Structure formats: structure tokens, C-alpha cells
A protein has these predicted regions:
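Amphipathic, heptad-repeat alpha-helical segments used for oligomerization and assembly
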Residues: 173-178, 182-186, 281-293
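Extracytoplasmic gating/loop element in the C-terminal half of outer-membrane beta-barrel translocons
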Residues: 214-321
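Intrinsic disorder/low-complexity segments
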Residues: 2, 102-103, 188-190, 211, ...
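Extracellular/periplasmic, surface-exposed regions of secreted and cell-surface proteins
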Residues: 1-121, 281-365
Length: 365
């Protein structure tokens, strides 16, 4: 790989440096990225590792440092960071496809009434787009289910009351890739952080938070539990108590079956990817299990106190600091899973960052 990059930045200070502002714009172009280049089937191989294509990452990073309050005994220091990144494919080898797209499939285009190809990688597009079948609820009666569109995903299995309703977007009586809708991207494009430090005489309080916006997560962990009888001993209570049991019971999820939803072709929870969803094991490709990954994380709340010199001089000590803190405290989030910091698109039940506590005494002789 070869990379060309340039940065333009400005570093400003105001009010005797009680307010500082750093702004940096970057633009990085990477040539000859390493990809799996598809091969013709006549070669006997599906792909080969190859250096081809160009990717541009550009964005802005902003850092603001301020001391809003500063008196003889009290001060408040505030640090804010913000970063925005846009990554797009600039160039791919000519393969006869529009935008030289590699991979992907066709979806319905309401603007034209026809179809358009999406997914994979293509010139002028971001990485990591995700599409899924649009879950509308459940069939409440056998009469409703009898009118369901044909579902090749379910290999011809007939629908019944309690099965999932997926939108037939193009109204052709068939559920296929053309009916998948765009859900979002797997990586956030906006991230930031907040650091507050408050000091009063020898007492210091530090509060650290960070956030991310712009990504979606497919809760494959919940989808697998709901869609596989082999996991019924680990079933999520919220999901189990909210599964369809009878007509118009207000449930959120399709019926839970002893038979595996996946193996027995119910396909109420786990759907095939059709080349534009995610082919990763555990992906649901079902909008029911997608949600925004936006979060605000509380990383640290710590407290420290420097004992006054008048207290410690008699002990022939130069400094004594007592401290305590809590770390990885929790999140404000929209995602219903445990851990929103997932940038691969699929949550396999990743264990979240462990919450930590510490306390101690630091002594200088």
C-alpha cells in the first residue's frame, strides 16, 4: 500500500491560554489496498489476494480546552474533543459494473420503480453499509398468514399465525434481496470526548466521558437465542416474555419454537444475507434486531485528596494523597444489547468492558 496525506491545522489560545482551540483537517489517499480480488469461475479459484483500488479518508478533528472558573481555591478545567471522518472508495479496477462495484446485489429503487445495485464495495461509496429485511410485526391469524408472499429464504415453508411479517417492498409477491432496506453503516463517523476536572484546595474530582454516533448494530446474539432451540436454556427473559403467543397480544417478537428457527426454515429471526446483508455467522439480516449504536460512555469518576502539609509534617512525609475511582461505569445508549462499542456490524454476545474500582493511598517520603 502507498499513502499520500496532508493536514491543515490551526492552534489558537485566548485569555492567557484559559481557552485553547485546536482544529485539524486531514485528507489521506491510500493506493493499492490489499483486497480479495474476485476471479472467474473458470480459474478454479474464487479470489486472489491483490493490491488494487484506492480509498480516501478525510475529516476534521477539533479539541477545545478551557478553564471556565479559576479562583484562589477552586478551578474547573474542561476538555472537549470531536472528530468526523468520511471514508470512501475512490478507484477500483474496471470490471464492467457500474461504479466498478465488487459484490453486492439488487434492491428495489422507489425513485425509478426499478432496481439498483448496492452493497459490496463501489467507487464513491462508504465502506460497511448494511441492508436487512424490513420486519413489520407478526401474522395474527391463519387467514393473514395465508396471504404472505413467497419466501425463498424459508425454502417454501408456509407461514402461520405468529410468524414474522417482512415487507414485500416491490410488491412482486416474493421476498428476496430486492426487498431489503438500508439500515446504516457499521462504523461511527462522529466520535468525541469530555473531560471535567474540578479542584478545590487539595480535593480533585475527575469525570471522563466519550461518545460515538453514526453506526448500527445487528444484535445477532439475541437473534440466535430467539431463533435456535439449542439456546433455549439461555433465552433472554425480555424477549421470551414478549414473543407472540396469541392473536393481538401486543408482542414484539415472532413466536418461539422448540424447533430451530434456522434449521427448520422458519426464518422469522435469522435471514440469509443475499449478498448485500452480512454473511458473517450470527448475522440476522432482520431489521427487528438492528438498532442505532449511538452511545455516551461514562469512563471514569475519580476522587483524590492531598492531605494538608500541616497534617503530615510531624510524620516527616512530603506528600500524602488518598484516592478512589470507578471506571467503565456504564452507558446512555439506544442499543438494547450489553455493549454498544461494536464496529463490525454484528454483536455475537461480546462481553462488555468490566467495571473497575480502585482506592489507595500514595505516600511520598
Amino acid at each position: 500500500e502507498t499513502t499520500e496525506s496532508y493536514d491543515i491545522g490551526v492552534d489558537l489560545g485566548f485569555f492567557n491560554n484559559r481557552l485553547g482551540l485546536l482544529i485539524d483537517y486531514y485528507n489521506k489517499l491510500t493506493f493499492d489496498r490489499l483486497y480479495d480480488e474476485p476471479l472467474w469461475s473458470s480459474t478454479g479459484f474464487s479470489s486472489i489476494k491483490s493490491n488494487y483500488g484506492s480509498v480516501r479518508n478525510s475529516g476534521v478533528e477539533i479539541e477545545l480546552n478551557a478553564t471556565p472558573i479559576q479562583t484562589k481555591d477552586f478551578s474547573w478545567d474542561l476538555g472537549l474533543t470531536f472528530a468526523y471522518n468520511k471514508g470512501v472508495v475512490v478507484d477500483l479496477p474496471d470490471n464492467g459494473e457500474e461504479k466498478h462495484r465488487v459484490g453486492g446485489n439488487f434492491v428495489y429503487d422507489p425513485a425509478t420503480g426499478g432496481t439498483k445495485k448496492v452493497g459490496g464495495i463501489a467507487e464513491g461509496e462508504r465502506f460497511g453499509g448494511r441492508w436487512a429485511f424490513h420486519y413489520l410485526g407478526t401474522y395474527q391469524t391463519e387467514e393473514e398468514a395465508a396471504k404472505a408472499p413467497n419466501d425463498p429464504n424459508a425454502q417454501g415453508r408456509k407461514k402461520h399465525a405468529g410468524d414474522a411479517i417482512f415487507e414485500d417492498v416491490n410488491n412482486d409477491g416474493q421476498l428476496d434481496s430486492k426487498d431489503m432496506i438500508f439500515m446504516g453503516y457499521v462504523r461511527p463517523d462522529k466520535v468525541g470526548g469530555i473531560i471535567n476536572t474540578l479542584k478545590y484546595k487539595g480535593l480533585t474530582v475527575r469525570i471522563v466521558m466519550d461518545w460515538a454516533m453514526g453506526h448500527v448494530i445487528d444484535n445477532g446474539f439475541k437473534g440466535q437465542i430467539m431463533g435456535s432451540s439449542r439456546n433455549n436454556n439461555n433465552a433472554i427473559k425480555e424477549a421470551m416474555t414478549n414473543s407472540w403467543q396469541s392473536a393481538n397480544d401486543g408482542s414484539k417478537y415472532p413466536k418461539y419454537t422448540v424447533q430451530s428457527d434456522y434449521d427448520y426454515q422458519y426464518r422469522n429471526h435469522m435471514r440469509w444475507d443475499n449478498q448485500i446483508g452480512s454473511s458473517a455467522s450470527g448475522s440476522t439480516n432482520n431489521s427487528l434486531y438492528f438498532s442505532k449504536g449511538d452511545y455516551l460512555a461514562f469512563r471514569e469518576v475519580s476522587l483524590s485528596y492531598m492531605l494538608p502539609l500541616s497534617w503530615i509534617r510531624k510524620m516527616r512525609l512530603s506528600a500524602v494523597e488518598v484516592f478512589a475511582g470507578a471506571y467503565n461505569i456504564g452507558y446512555i445508549k439506544k442499543y438494547d444489547g450489553m455493549f454498544p462499542e461494536i464496529y463490525t456490524g454484528v454483536d455475537y454476545g461480546i462481553y462488555p468492558r468490566p467495571r473497575q474500582y480502585n482506592m489507595g493511598v500514595k505516600i511520598n517520603f
